[in-house]
């Protein structure tokens, strides 16, 4: 069978089997299948002449090997619609020929029926839209339902444009569409020129010991003071020297109770010993945070090029991912639990897995008179009201691993996740792709198929 070539906006090209008896509108519907450009948005031209939807391809003497051009032009649709009532009634025979042809985009079942009866169309869809073709072959009703809903939404927007292009509702939708296009272009630019920004970044950890107990310290230049959890202080046997006069509430991304302060204890980095002051927090996920107080005091150099922390004459290597499995697994479970709680309580969505926010506050005041019980109590009250020690969010895990329970976020809705799973994508990867695609399931599917 002869084929014709159709250029889409001079960017993409598709091959279509030539059927001289079919109308121009039928040809546009086939193009709509492969490009999702609505029929009303298509302007089909041959040698610069616009083709009429009502006429057959044979009326324009179109033959195999001809080259047709399709451009998107929303403004042409109202003119065509307005001209239709003025046209005299055509003979009944052409209309009767088109009556049996149903719009295959009305429902998922219509799509399946159409491609079952037209295998040559399915072959073209396999080449142009693999995700849709896979859904048709596997009879994935969820994917097809979503596809039909998208087409109907596009048609609704088109109807609004025809009815009142300057109306508030259409202008709002048009603005959202333009904004989404700009976002997609920005993301595509980033994926092409700086793909590394989509990779997970691991926090900086080093090996150290507190009071002779080995620890993995989280190096955080955004933490104003060095912090330790209450449980870690017990393991390091320094709970007995916690000064509870420095208790209060630490406020940052969240809140945590400060039970006190250890004014000085031994910190071993490499082969050197340093004195460190610690704020002890009751509910702190990270065992030990090496804060800016120590980093500035000892003029620490964070050499990210060589992957080392230089303090005095010591050079301590930052830990690699393989050394942080226990920490990352714990943080991953915490992240999933927080996401479930946030979803259940309809709270604001949390940050994505590739973002970690660090917030610090001012340090506590030193008691003015440690020998007077009265002064101690007064200073204790002042610390409760005015003291804001540092608190920073724990580093977030790389990527959630598959779990029996569904995990969603603001971009990865359960329906979109199931759509990608139906394409053969794992749940974990589906969530990550939807997050990167800002919830656009089509973009996520394209990323999955490469």
UniProtKB/Swiss-Prot annotation:
The record's Gene Ontology biological-process terms are: ubiquitin-dependent protein catabolic process
Q: Which residues form a coiled coil?
A: 321-346
**Native organism taxonomy:** Eukaryota, Amoebozoa, Evosea, Eumycetozoa, Dictyostelia
Region named Disordered: 78-116, 335-410
* Comp. bias (Polar residues): 104-116
Q: Which UniProt keywords apply?
A: Aspartyl protease, Coiled coil, Hydrolase, Protease
Concerning its family, UniProt says: Belongs to the DDI1 family.
Q: Which residues form the UBA domain?
A: 411-450
Q: What is this protein called?
A: Protein DDI1 homolog
């Amino acid at each position: 069978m002869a084929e014709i070539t159709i250029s889409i906006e001079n960017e993409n090209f598709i091959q279509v089997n030539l059927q001289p008896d079919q109308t121009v509108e039928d040809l546009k519907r086939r193009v709509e299948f492969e490009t999702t450009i609505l029929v009303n948005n298509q302007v089909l031209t041959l040698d610069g002449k616009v083709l009429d939807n009502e006429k057959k391809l044979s009326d324009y003497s179109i033959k195999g090997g001809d080259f047709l051009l399709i451009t998107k032009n929303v403004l042409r649709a109202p003119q065509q619609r307005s001209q239709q009532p003025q046209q005299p009634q055509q003979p009944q025979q052409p209309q009767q020929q088109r009556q049996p042809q149903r719009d295959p985009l009305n429902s998922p079942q219509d799509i399946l029926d159409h491609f079952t009866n037209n295998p040559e169309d399915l072959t073209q869809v396999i080449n142009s839209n693999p995700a849709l073709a896979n859904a048709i072959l596997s009879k994935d009703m969820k994917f097809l339902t979503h596809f039909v809903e998208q087409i109907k939404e596009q048609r609704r927007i088109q109807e609004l444009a025809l009815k009142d292009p300057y109306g508030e509702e259409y202008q709002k939708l048009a603005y959202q569409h333009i904004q989404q296009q700009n976002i997609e272009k920005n993301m595509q630019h980033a994926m092409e020129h700086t793909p590394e920004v989509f990779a997970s970044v691991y926090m900086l950890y080093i090996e150290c010991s507190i009071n002779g107990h080995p620890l993995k310290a989280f190096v955080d230049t955004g933490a104003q003071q060095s912090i330790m959890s209450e449980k870690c202080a017990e393991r390091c046997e320094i709970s007995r020297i916690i000064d509870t006069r420095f208790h209060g509430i630490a406020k940052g991304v969240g809140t945590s109770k400060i039970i006190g302060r250890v004014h000085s204890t031994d910190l071993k980095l490499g082969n050197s010993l340093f004195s460190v002051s610690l704020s002890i927090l009751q509910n702190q996920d990270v065992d030990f945070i090496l804060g800016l107080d120590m980093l500035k005091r000892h003029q620490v150099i964070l050499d990210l090029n060589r992957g080392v922390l230089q303090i005095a004459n010591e050079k301590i290597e930052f830990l690699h991912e393989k050394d942080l499995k226990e920490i990352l697994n714990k943080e991953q479970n915490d992240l999933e639990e927080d996401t479930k709680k946030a979803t259940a309580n309809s709270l604001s969505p949390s940050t994505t897995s590739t973002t970690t926010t660090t917030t610090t506050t001012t340090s506590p005041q030193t008691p003015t008179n440690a020998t007077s019980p009265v002064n101690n109590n007064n200073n204790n009250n002042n610390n409760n009201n005015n003291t804001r020690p540092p608190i920073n969010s724990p580093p977030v895990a790389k990527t959630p691993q598959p779990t029996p329970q569904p995990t969603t976020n603001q971009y990865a809705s359960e329906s979109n996740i199931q759509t990608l799973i139906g394409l053969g994508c794992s749940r974990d990867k589906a969530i990550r792709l939807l997050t990167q695609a800002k919830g656009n399931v089509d973009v996520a599917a394209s990323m999955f198929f490469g």
